[in-house]
Amino acid sequence: MTGLFEKYQDKKEFIENRFNELKNRGLNDENLIFSLIEKEIKTNFIVPQKLKSEMYDKVNYMCRRYMDRIARFELDYDFIPDIDALKYALICIFESVPVFHSQFIDNHINPYWKVCDYHVDEILTVIETNDFLTSTDEFLLQGIPVTSNVQFKVALLINGRESKLCFRWNHMLVDGGDYKHFVNDLFKNYNEYVENKTMPLDFRKGSRSYKCVYDDFNESDKKKAKSQFAGVSPHDKHTLPFTEKGEGDNKFIARKSVPSAIFNKARETVKKYDGTVNDLIATAYIGAVYEICNLPEQEKVGISCAVDLRRYIKNINKTGYTNHTTFMPTIVENKGENIFDILKQVVECNKKNKEDKFMGLHGLPLLNIGYSTMVYAQAEIVVGLFYNNANLAISNVGKMDLDALSLSGHKPVGAAVAGAAKKKPCAMMTALTINGNLQLSICSVGNEEDKKILENFFDVLSEKIKELSEY
């Protein structure tokens, strides 16, 4: 500490207080503490006492009426990570992004985040288990109250020489797109520490505002983008045949893996129709809806598909970890004679969506007006009147970057993502690709019969992908 005192003589009190604070939070490597403090001094970074709640924070908070606000992710490894290195990396990213250790204060007028004290053991839990699936669900299906002092929870599950890292976090803070950035940055610092006992500490500290999506437009297009008031929700009323809501309903995750041999062949087929992986997944989902719900062949079906608005941000590192996801409708007019007729309609619909220069930006200005011109309690009621929660929806996180997710040279051997647990009749499916395999999941609130319904839905959906692979 003497070296820091000599270098920053006018910061002695700050250095002493910050050193003790970081030690009390579980950071026991003094050299790393000094590096973190010096970076804060050089960048004039001071941990605030409170932070502004952004528009998407409020939108996701409003959605607590029909979902638990928690997003989930799991990664499988064939070794045991260094627990201290993982703890230190977590502390460093939390210190750099104070909203991660904050409480959401709903004062009904203008909610905000109150930055809190914490210990790393409140973030990371290490669990010995002989049943990965049970332990995973026990951890992932828990909630995180907005009054919690930390908004990310991590579990390291250990079974012999294998391990699983499970993450659950408050969706008000971060969506799946920025979770990938978060975990990539976390692991980058973990790996550097394991190898060299240092960390680059290059975490994103920029704005979390939804308005970042407009920054790289020219002035003319920016004005037009900020005028896209009308929403584009599909307003489709179809639902899967869930049971009625009951007292015995609980949270659960239904999962399905489509093997690479089938998935890759289906991808090649879809390419011949000028389609994408998102088109493939949407086609199989819609085809399964027609079959499970026994819909007439001429019935129109529309689902909502997630759109990552980071497509409009040229340098994502200038922004903070946040939500930049909205939804666009994918609509087919009829079932057609086979799955390929659905595919053609999906590809055509999504091509038209992509021709829109402002795809995904529709409705954002209206949300902003709602939250910026009224006190929060009133805005929540008004926004809730026009905010549409789709019954049928898809969010594809995409292909996992195995190198970025490697720990000490060990690439993950498996991964899965699950969104918030939504109440019936919502069936929000999340997807990712790892090692060529397509991993699907739906997190829901229901009973055992509902879980069987979703598992059957996944079986039918997988058959639709297989049909696409047999072109």
Language-model features and meaning:
Residues 197-235:
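Secretion/export-associated helical scaffolds and adjacent low-complexity Pro/Gly/Ser/Thr-rich regions
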Residues 220-275:
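Flexible, P/S/T/G-rich "lid" or insertion loops adjacent to the active sites of thioester-utilizing
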